[in-house]
Structure formats: structure tokens, C-alpha cells
Amino acid sequence: GKDDYVAPAGQKKDWYNAYFTLPHEFWTEQHFATLSPAALAVLLIVLKETTKKPDVELLREKMQDWYGISGKTVTKGIQELMAAGLIEERLRWEEDLSAKLGYVKHHHYGLTGVFSTEERAGRRRVARRKRRLNERKKSKKAAQEAKS
């Protein structure tokens, strides 16, 4: 983009400035070092777009406008992620009477394993529980120290 960078605030209502979860396996399994820039770009885009839904349609003709990467780069990234077993394609057929066959094929992509929407949501729930437990422990400890 042409706008100045603004750090994400992580607010639920501000979808475009929200954080997304990057599983620690991204680092421990060396994906950051072994994937090409094209695959990394697509991985990060799909991670962001699948925070609340299991897959996303990547329209190659729109990717330049939306993310600043070419359709060719998206295709290369998808192929590499599929070969690595990190992403899977889900075809959806929709009725379109203006199409030759009366249907149009849509390519949706979802991440697999620890990168999947479901797995990341589960990890966020566990982290949230742990954080709340730690906060309660700190509050109890502070209350006990205040009484002393």
C-alpha cells in the first residue's frame, strides 16, 4: 500500500488491523528458512484470511491489488505449499447460468495440520485459559501480600 504503516491494535472489530496466530512450528520446523518467498507470502496471506474460516478463495487476478503480489507468485506459492503438505485445495462448484456448462469452479485453499484454522483456534483457547489462570494467581498473590 501507499498509506503509512500503522501497527495492528488487535481489536476484534477492526478485522484489517487484527493479529493472526503463527504456530511455533513455523520456526521449529524451519519453514521460515526452507520455503521460498512466494510460498511464505501465500502462507501468511492464507493464515490471515483463515483466522475465522477454514479456507479462502485466492483470486489470482485480484492478488496484485489486494496484497501486492502477482497471480504467478500466488500459483508458485500454492504449488510449493501443496508439495510441502501445508495447504490443500477445496473445489467448489457454483451455478452460473452465464457459464458454458452452467457452473463455475472456485478454488479455495485451507491450511493443514498445526496451521489449520481449527488447530490455531484450539491453541488460542488454551493460551487464553493459561493467561487467565496466571492472572488469577497473580491477583491472589498480590491480595495476600497486601494483607501481610
Question: What is the role of each PLM region?
Answer:
Residues 1-14, 93-120:
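Short, cationic-aromatic polyanion-contact patches
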Residues 1-61:
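Short recognition helix of helix-turn-helix/winged-helix DNA-binding domains
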Residues 50-105:
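Winged helix-turn-helix DNA-binding recognition segment
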Residues 63-64, 108-109, 128-132:
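Short, low-complexity, polar/charged sequence segments that are solvent-exposed and flexible
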Residues 113-148:
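Charged low-complexity intrinsically disordered patches
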